[in-house]
Amino acid sequence: MKNIVKIVAVTIITVLMLLACSGCYSSPPKIQSGEFPFVIEYEYEGKTYIIEDTVVCSYGGVNPDAGIPTRWYACKLKNNSDVRILTFEKNTESFLVEGMINEASYITLDYGYGGYYLGDRLYKDSGPCFSYVEMQVSPTGVKSTKYTSLTKKEIEKLFDIKIIRFEFSPPIENTFE
């Protein structure tokens, strides 16, 4: 009887694993790459800045190590390594951790995840946004990086940066086979 229970348990687990590996999360997208231009225009201290670039995305395959196989995407900017809206002076007080002094801090564009642009419904909420980043060193010498997403209203209210345009190409409609 114990052997039958073991065989049934192993069979059920094997079937579930095979179903997961062949499921919708591992299906490749029909359109596997794309370019998505964007424009950001903002005003800071009376001066207007315009940033134009293109987010380049491609399907990278399936990651089977996550328990349920998931699609992996690569994403980068065509002309820049990153987009910093504003960099603050060193040794400024932390906005995120009371009493901490920043080694560096800046507002950057988080241009989103490749799956968002390539129409993967699992990443429909992973589009572009602004992030505030702080790099800190504690009194004991431990380095850490903290960040938080910011809305356009928060950027205007907290940092006196007026966002004039924030235009991104929309994600494509895609199918997964």
Which positions does each model-derived feature cover?
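Positively charged n-region of N-terminal signal peptides that target proteins for export
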Residues: 1-6
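Sparse, context-dependent recognition of short Cys/His-centered cofactor- or disulfide-binding micro-motifs
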Residues: 9, 25-27, 71
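Hydrophobic helical h-region of N-terminal Sec-dependent signal peptides
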Residues: 9-18
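C-terminal motif of bacterial Sec signal peptides marking the signal peptidase cleavage site
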Residues: 19-23
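Short structured motifs
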Residues: 24-26, 37, 81
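Alpha-helical transmembrane signal-anchor/signal-peptide segments
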Residues: 28-45
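Structured domain cores in non-transmembrane regions
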Residues: 35, 47-146
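Glycine-rich, aromatic-bearing surface loops/beta-hairpins
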Residues: 128-177
